[in-house]
Amino acid sequence: LWSLEDAQRNGARFLKYLEVESIAEARSVPATDLLEAAVTFPACDWSGQGDDVVWAPMTNWIPCVDGTFLVEQYRDALIAGHRVPCDLLVGNTTGEFMVPGPDGTPYPEGECGNLDMIDAWVSGGGSEPYRYRFDVDMPGDDAGAFHSSDLWFSFGTLPASWRPFRGWHYDLSHAMNRYWTNFAATGDPNGSGLPEWTACGPDGQRY
């Protein structure tokens, strides 16, 4: 999450991009123009490498720690135990963000931040996190298990895809849909006829 100061700096950049002098003047800009500008607005890069970096719509408009609505960074809140104890279902695809950006530059090595967050969640107690790792190669163009490819399965929308899914894909989708529905209803994804899904614990990662 951004700091309030960085969010304010980015807001000032956006006003300049809109060619307006104040928030009041910005409010007179037609909504369609605002939406278009929000997408084309160059991404902010405080590292000094230049403003025009990829994924601008994703990186420009993220929450900030403003001291009122959000009072601390999410990771810090987890570690300090400042959260409502609730069950969690979280996961990733094996090909998550493995394709380079539009300029072909490979992504730097990550620091396993999501695993650290899960560890912090488990250590805080009072909840049971269930974790999944989606590893199904998408048929059609050998794209692998790319970002969001699990959504077709969990929401049961395989028929809406152009990809040549087969019978076992639909079986997996049905099982995932049941897991997700059970979790939403009870906080536990397990149910009759489903392979047991064990919650993560402080002693190690389980999928």
Which residue stretches match the model-derived regions?
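Substrate-access "cap/lid" subdomains that shape
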Residues: 1-119
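Mobile gating loops/cap/lid regions near enzyme active sites that modulate substrate access
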Residues: 47, 119, 123-207
